[in-house]
Amino acid sequence: FFVEGDPEALLMLQINAHTEEELEKEIVSLIKTVEDSGLSYANATLVGDNIAKAIELRKAGLGLLGNIVGDMKAVACIEDTAVALSDLKEFIAEFTLIMKGYNQKAVYYAHAGAGELHLRPILNLKKSSDVALFRNITTDVAKLTKKYRGSFSGEHGDGIVRAEFIPLMIGDKNYELLRRIKSYF
């Protein structure tokens, strides 16, 4: 209902304003910025019920992207990284290079305005070679996230998959301090 053509990506922005005039001014400014960038060929302004439809589309997006037919799946191992907005462009570029280095593709999904990234490599975990890639990609992205002083668990907990990377992310001394605190409970 608002997507034109076959885009490589969608970026949805929400603009809030106190008056219709302020809103219109913000929309005109944003559209001009997007057009001047040359990075987008389409822009749609949604109002009314279409806003709710777009939000539902966004909510369904990760499920749709993760529902790949066959043994190749968008796997959860690095899906909760977060970096500062000022580092987002460089982080994504380096992440893309990591994936190219492994000759792999990934699903890119994000709350970009918050720097929260839901990146999922597409792997076949029935193959031992892809299980090894799962581990290598996770390790490389943990190091990349650390390089940008980001969080490897920006929205959710560390869990089984990311727990081993806590010392890397917070340092051995801080990790040992946390272990000592936990031992008291």
What are these regions (language model features)?
Residues 1-111, 115-154, 159-185:
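Noncatalytic alpha-helical scaffold of FAD-dependent oxidoreductases
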